[in-house]
């Protein structure tokens, strides 16, 4: 059961991927008004960004009650982040582990910048809650996806803006199978199908082939994790190890 908080309004960091789409549905079920925020930071492809409008429109058609709560969409040009980042998310380079153990898909400072800009927009728009799809359980180990990071950032933003914005991360302790299950809990098979078809996760931007779990190359870490999560969702298992 999702506890509704009808007195609050939220801003969802919405990239067009599976996790942020599930968070959008979570927020639409919970809050009175929900706006969305995306960033163009010089990603190596724009496929995920191009999915944003399609998913918003599809959700509004499929769930009339949510359509009434779905507010404005905001797109921010953050190309400076791509200009200062040398990662597999912003360059056409092979995806691999780095010397510090993190995959080279990690974009330093990305979520810190995203949340700071989101907080500034929320301040101006009178929104009380920021919702992000960060989690500690997807095996990537990104430090800016950790619960401690988000809690510290909430304190810093509230001190720096003299406000009381709340940072919500509904996927923080869920594995990818649990994320599919949450989508089903929120909107049944219809929402699961929208997430499967209308969102994009693949690091290389492949959208030519529709697999059981969605579009993608099927080989990059993001595709393998999404596939493993979907299989775990169908079987009722937990995703207890990194997919290979």
Curated annotation (Swiss-Prot):
<keyword id="KW-0671">Queuosine biosynthesis</keyword>
<keyword id="KW-0547">Nucleotide-binding</keyword>
<keyword id="KW-0479">Metal-binding</keyword>
<dbReference type="InterPro" id="IPR014729">
    <property type="entry name" value="Rossmann-like_a/b/a_fold"/>
</dbReference>
<comment type="similarity">
    <text>Belongs to the QueC family.</text>
</comment>
<dbReference type="GO" id="GO:0005524">
    <property type="term" value="F:ATP binding"/>
</dbReference>
<feature type="binding site">
    <location>
        <position position="223"/>
    </location>
    <ligand>
        <name>Zn(2+)</name>
    </ligand>
</feature>
<dbReference type="GO" id="GO:0008270">
    <property type="term" value="F:zinc ion binding"/>
</dbReference>
<dbReference type="Pfam" id="PF06508">
    <property type="entry name" value="QueC"/>
</dbReference>
<protein>
    <recommendedName>
        <fullName>7-cyano-7-deazaguanine synthase</fullName>
        <ecNumber>6.3.4.20</ecNumber>
    </recommendedName>
</protein>
<comment type="function">
    <text>Catalyzes the ATP-dependent conversion of 7-carboxy-7-deazaguanine (CDG) to 7-cyano-7-deazaguanine (preQ(0)).</text>
</comment>
<keyword id="KW-0436">Ligase</keyword>
<dbReference type="GO" id="GO:0016879">
    <property type="term" value="F:ligase activity, forming carbon-nitrogen bonds"/>
</dbReference>
<keyword id="KW-0067">ATP-binding</keyword>
<comment type="pathway">
    <text>Purine metabolism; 7-cyano-7-deazaguanine biosynthesis.</text>
</comment>
<feature type="binding site">
    <location>
        <position position="220"/>
    </location>
    <ligand>
        <name>Zn(2+)</name>
    </ligand>
</feature>
<feature type="binding site">
    <location>
        <position position="217"/>
    </location>
    <ligand>
        <name>Zn(2+)</name>
    </ligand>
</feature>
<dbReference type="GO" id="GO:0008616">
    <property type="term" value="P:queuosine biosynthetic process"/>
</dbReference>
<dbReference type="InterPro" id="IPR018317">
    <property type="entry name" value="QueC"/>
</dbReference>
<feature type="binding site">
    <location>
        <position position="202"/>
    </location>
    <ligand>
        <name>Zn(2+)</name>
    </ligand>
</feature>
<feature type="binding site">
    <location>
        <begin position="14"/>
        <end position="24"/>
    </location>
    <ligand>
        <name>ATP</name>
    </ligand>
</feature>
<keyword id="KW-0862">Zinc</keyword>
């Amino acid at each position: 059961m999702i506890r509704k908080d009808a007195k609050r309004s939220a801003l969802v960091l919405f990239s067009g991927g599976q996790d942020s789409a599930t968070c959008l549905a979570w927020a639409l079920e919970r809050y009175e008004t929900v706006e969305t925020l995306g960033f163009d930071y010089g990603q190596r492809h724009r496929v995920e960004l191009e999915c944003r409008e399609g998913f918003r429109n599809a959700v509004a058609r499929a769930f009339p009650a949510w359509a009434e709560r779905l507010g404005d969409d905001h797109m921010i040009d953050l190309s400076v982040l791509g200009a200062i980042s040398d990662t597999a998310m912003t360059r056409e380079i092979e995806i691999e582990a780095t010397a510090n153990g993190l995959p080279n898909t990690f974009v330093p400072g990305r979520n810190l910048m995203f949340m700071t800009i989101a907080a500034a927009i929320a301040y101006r728009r009178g929104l009380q809650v920021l919702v992000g799809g960060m989690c500690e359980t997807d095996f990537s180990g990104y430090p800016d996806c950790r619960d401690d990071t988000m809690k510290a950032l909430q304190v810093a933003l509230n001190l720096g803006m003299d406000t009381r914005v709340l940072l919500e991360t509904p996927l923080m302790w869920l594995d990818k199978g649990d994320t599919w299950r949450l989508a089903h809990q929120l909107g049944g098979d219809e929402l699961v199908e929208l997430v499967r078809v209308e969102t994009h996760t693949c690091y290389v931007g492949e959208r030519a082939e529709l697999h059981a779990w969605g579009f993608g190359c099927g080989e990059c870490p993001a595709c393998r994790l999404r596939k493993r999560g979907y299989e775990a969702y169908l079987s009722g298992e937990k995703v207890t190890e990194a997919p290979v």
